[in-house]
C-alpha cells in the first residue's frame, strides 16, 4: 500500500509539473505574441527618406522666352547666326532651406512675314492687335520682339515696352556686341513679367525670417483653394442718411470679370450686407482749420476690431474671408478723412489691412443737407468705390506694380483689371508657396511621428503622404520644364494631401495613452496569472537541478 501511495504521489507531482510547463508554454508561445499583436500601434510605412530629401530640393523655375528679331534690329552677321538658344540662370538669394534658381531659356529666331508687317505699323497697339494670338502661348511663356533701333513703333525715349498679354518689345542695336546687350535687356523685361526676388520673397514670407523682409512682403493672402469676399455698407447714422448702393451691379461690372480671370488660382464667392448703427470704435479728431474730422494713421489698427464683431464670424468658413467696408460717417463726424503718416489726407480716403481686407470712408456731399430734410438720400458712386476696392484686392493677392527696367513703357491692364502675364506671375508665386508649405507640412509630420511612437498611422494617412510627396516631385519637375499650369495643379494637390494627412483625426487616437497607463491597466490583468506560473517554473527548475546532482555511491 505504501508503494502504491508513493507512486500515486509521484504521478501527481509529474502531472503538476507538466501542467505548469503547459500553461507556461501557452502563455509564452501563444499568449505573449497574441497580446503583443492585438495591442501594438499600427503604423503604416512612410517614405521618410523621400521626405527628408525634400529639404534639399532644388527648384529650377524655367521661363520659356521666344525672342523674335526683325530686319535691321541687329547686324547682318548676327542675323545669319539665327536661330539658336541661350540660357540665363541665376540663384535667388533667399535664406530658405529650399534652393531656388530662375532659368530664362531664350530661343532666338527671325521674324516671320506677318510679324514683320505687324511690327512695321505706326503704333505698338496696332501691332499687338495684329499679333494677338494669346491662345497659342502656353502659361508662363513670353514672346519678346526686337525691333530696329530707329523704329517709330515706340516713343524715341523708350527702349522697351511691356504689353498686357505675354508679349514685349525691345529696341535692337547695331553693335558688334548686339546679342549680349540685347540679351541683358530681354532678361530685365522677362524678370519684370515673371519672376523677381520680391515676388518669390512675398510668396515665401511665412517661411523666411521676419527681419529679412518688410511687412509689405507679408501682405498677400496665403494660397488657398477658395476665397470668400464680403462687401459691407456701414451706416452708423440711418436717421440722417438713407444710403443706396448698387452693389450687385457693381460686382457684375467690375469685380466679377477680375475674379473670372483669377479663377485658375481658386474659387471665389461674393456676398454683401448692410449694417446699421455700426460705429468705427475710434473717436476722430476735429480740425478747426478745415472744419473736418480726421483719423490718424496710428489709430487705424483700432478701427477693425470693433467693426469685425458686427461682420459675422469667419471661423466657420473653410476658406480665407476678405472684408471690404464702405463706411458713411455719421452727420456729427462729417466730413471724415484718413491721414497718412505725415498727417496729409489720403487721396482715396481708404486703407487696407494685410490678409483681412480694406475700409473706405465715403463722405456725403454737404450740399445735399441744405436742400433736403433728414434723412437725406445718398446715392453711392460705385465707380469710385470699386476703383479703390479693386486696387486693394490686387494688393491683397500680391498683384503689385512690377519693377520695370529704365526707359520701359508699361501698358495698362485690360478691362478685367488684370494683365495675362500678371496672372502667370501669380501662378509662379503660388506654385512656389504651395511647394514650400507642403514640404514644411510633410517634414513636420515625419518629425512628429518619429518622436512619438504611439501615434497610429493608418493606410489612408500613408496614402495621402505618398500622394503629397509624388505631387511635390511632379510639380518641381513641371516647373523645371516650364509647364506652369500643370506645376500649379500639382502644387495644389501637394498642399491638399499633406494637410489632409497632417490633420487626420486618427493620428490622435492613442496619442494620450502613455506607458504608465498601459502598466496600470495590464498589471492587474496579468499579475494574478503570471505569479503562480512563475513560482511553478522556479520550483520545477530547482527540483530538476537537485535531480541532476545524484549522490555518489559509497562501497
UniProtKB/Swiss-Prot annotation:
GO cellular component annotations of the record: GPI-anchor transamidase complex
Similarity field: Belongs to the PIGS family.
GO biological process, one term: GPI anchor biosynthetic process
Annotated keywords: Endoplasmic reticulum, Glycoprotein, GPI-anchor biosynthesis, Membrane, Transmembrane, Transmembrane helix
Segments on the Lumenal side according to the record's topology features: 40-517
Localisation: Endoplasmic reticulum membrane
Binding residues for a cardiolipin: 15, 18
Pathway recorded for this protein: Glycolipid biosynthesis; glycosylphosphatidylinositol-anchor biosynthesis
Name recorded for this polypeptide: GPI-anchor transamidase component PIGS
Parts of the chain that traverse the membrane: 19-39, 518-532
Annotated source species: Mus musculus (Mouse)
Pfam families referenced in this protein's UniProt entry, alphabetically: PIG-S
InterPro entries (alphabetical): PtdIno-glycan_biosynth_class_S
Assembly notes: Heteropentamer. Part of the GPI-anchor transamidase complex, consisting of PIGK, PIGT, PIGS, PIGU and GAA1.
Function summary: Component of the glycosylphosphatidylinositol-anchor (GPI-anchor) transamidase (GPI-T) complex that catalyzes the formation of the linkage between a proprotein and a GPI-anchor and participates in GPI anchored protein biosynthesis.
Record gene name: Pigs
Record: glycosylation sites: 267, 370
Residue ranges that the UniProt entry lists as topological domain Cytoplasmic: 2-18, 533-555
Topology of the protein relative to the lipid bilayer: Multi-pass membrane protein
